[in-house]
Amino acid sequence: MQAIHTVQLLLKPSKYECQEIDRRFHALAHLHNVCVKHARKCMIRLQHDKQYSEALQLYHELSKKEKLSKKEKSQKSELSKKLEDRRIELGLSKAALERYLKVCGKRFSKLLSSQQVQTEADRVWSGVAKCLFENGKGLHFTKYMDFDTIGGKSNKNGARFDLDAMYVNWIGLSLKCYLPKSENSDAYV
């Protein structure tokens, strides 16, 4: 496994570069909130689905029992599979949210990479999973100011640092990096 290090370098972006970075964060916030809206709709459909609620009730009854017979164990696994299939049919899965945001993300393809959009869908899915399988209360919309980073699935994608030229390249945007002048500085590399 490779070690990952974080280096903080000083950026002095121009007015245009600041606006471009803001556009990217606004695009990410918009995509996140669109995905949350879609996931909420799917969760409401799931709550009102009679097949799902009946299967879920049976599943909970079996889960409360301490000792299960082989027949009950197989019935529980069948119910689990049935619940999962119904969630997938209604569009509540990690892959379904990624597919949904893929379509929405085409509009922002010059601002965000596809893997950055997929990562945002994964963040929304983790919230959905907490609501469905744990003690989560509900999904929340996120304000633009609450985003402090745009993540990706790997280091090969998104913002890339060019050590020779001292630039950060990020889908058509090049930002000049500056090293601190003295070795005593906290941010010295």
Model-assigned labels for residue ranges:
Residues 1-189:
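Nucleic-acid substrate recognition interfaces
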